[in-house]
UniProtKB/Swiss-Prot annotation:
Location of this chain's protein in the cell: Nucleus
Originating species: Phaeosphaeria nodorum (strain SN15 / ATCC MYA-4574 / FGSC 10173) (Glume blotch fungus)
A Gene Ontology BP annotation from the UniProt entry: double-strand break repair via homologous recombination
Cofactors, names only: a divalent metal cation
Feature: compositional bias, Basic residues: 109-123
Protein name: Structure-specific endonuclease subunit SLX1
Comp. bias regions, Acidic residues: 339-359
A single MF term (Gene Ontology): zinc ion binding
InterPro entries: GIY-YIG_endonuc, GIY-YIG_endonuc_sf, Slx1, SLX1_C, SLX1_endonuclease, Znf_RING/FYVE/PHD
Length: 366
């Protein structure tokens, strides 16, 4: 396959998300991004090395992961969204009039200290403000067509999300998935192997697939279909589907054998959705089985199949059984392994940027 046909030099990351942490005193929050939520939560709570300086103060631990935004096509995309979420008052992804309105709302009752020509300081933000800002970002042109989904772990935060966002004028695309999967707040547990106090990571967060596990069955199916001796035809244009000259997509439905040229299926999906003015579709109907298919699902498999030689070797490598039955010890072992696997991907570039905390209801702000 020629270089011109390659969509990227590396496959789309297995997983990348932005997250919102809340401290145990429920007055401090932290927004970050990571390729592995379980490992990152352990870092913030001091169970493994790493984590932001701002979350390292013992008085604020344990931190709980209240929600995550998933589906980012690259680490740079996640970092872009992370910065915009942290700095909604300054990001250019939101129209200036909306930015100003949001900043004015947050500054109500507070003395303005910004002089003309000087960059506006980040206003203090409550949980409500952070959730409203998140809703704004998910609906703006820059991000609304990304394959993003929202998952909550804190039931009370999910309730606030529904309460505040239902009153907003902006709307989210219908295909975005918003779900609640409750997670326990991290609790201290004695680690007998090191005699240190570590925090258990909630099982629902540990169970998030972060290493292409959810693509394995799809890859196996695609290999069977594409390696078949029979001549394959595009499900859209009916012409031969030759992998040596074209990028070929395979339907992810297990019982369906339909393959299509990337350009043909893209045009079909865009036509179905009446979105010919855009470049990348969101979803569409398989020309074979007529199932509704997510475009991002097929592109992720294609990028892994064509550019993920090393990742595929790791994915199909036989796994050794874990010897330890101690959850705390297992957490530590997992953290070390994951740290080696994604150390270069886990971004901490925002650590030194201060994030204003929600003001205490007892003390008056100066």
């Amino acid at each position: 396959m020629s270089e011109a046909l390659k969509i990227e030099s590396r496959p789309i990351p297995a997983f990348y998300c932005c997250y919102l942490l809340r401290s145990k005193n429920r007055k401090s929050y932290y927004i970050g991004s990571t390729p592995n939520p379980a490992r990152r939560l352990g870092q913030h709570n001091g169970s493994s090395k790493g984590g932001a300086k701002r979350t390292s103060m013992q008085g604020k631990r344990p931190w709980e992961m209240t929600c995550i935004v998933t589906g980012f096509p690259s680490k740079f995309a996640a970092l872009q969204f992370e910065w915009a979420w942290q700095n909604t008052h300054a990001t250019r992804h939101i129209d200036k009039d909306v930015r100003d309105a949001r900043a004015e709302e947050l500054q109500k009752g507070k003395k303005k200290a910004t002089s003309p020509g000087r960059r506006r300081k980040r206003p203090p933000m409550s949980l409500e403000a952070r959730l409203k800002n998140l809703h704004h970002l998910l609906s703006v042109d820059s991000f609304c067509r990304w394959p993003l989904n929202l998952r909550f772990f804190a039931p009370d935060v999910f309730v606030q999300w529904e309460r505040h966002t239902t009153k907003m004028t902006t709307t989210l695309r219908k295909s975005i998935t918003i779900q609640l999967t409750p997670a326990e707040i991290p609790k201290l547990a004695s680690d007998v192997s090191t005699e240190l106090q570590t925090h258990f990571i909630p099982e629902v967060i540990r169970a998030i697939p972060v290493a292409y596990e959810d693509c394995k069955q799809y890859i196996e199916k695609s290999r069977r279909v594409l390696e078949d001796d029979q001549r394959l035809g595009c499900g859209v244009c009916k012409n031969p589907a030759d992998m040596s000259s074209s990028l070929i997509l395979v339907c992810p439905i297990e019982a369906c054998q339909t393959v299509s040229h990337l350009s043909c299926l893209s045009n079909k999906f865009l036509t179905e959705g009446g979105e010919l003015e855009t470049l990348v579709p969101l979803e569409g109907t398989c020309p074979g089985c007529r199932s509704c298919i997510k475009w991002a699902t097929m592109i992720k498999e294609l990028s892994l199949r064509t550019n993920g030689e090393e990742e595929l070797k790791l994915l199909f490598k036989p796994k050794r059984k874990r010897k330890s039955d101690n959850p705390a010890e297992s957490d530590a072992a997992d953290g070390q392994a994951l740290e080696q696997e994604d150390e270069e991907l886990d971004e901490t570039w925002m650590e030194d940027m201060s994030q204003d905390e929600e003001p205490s209801p007892v003390k008056k702000s100066r």
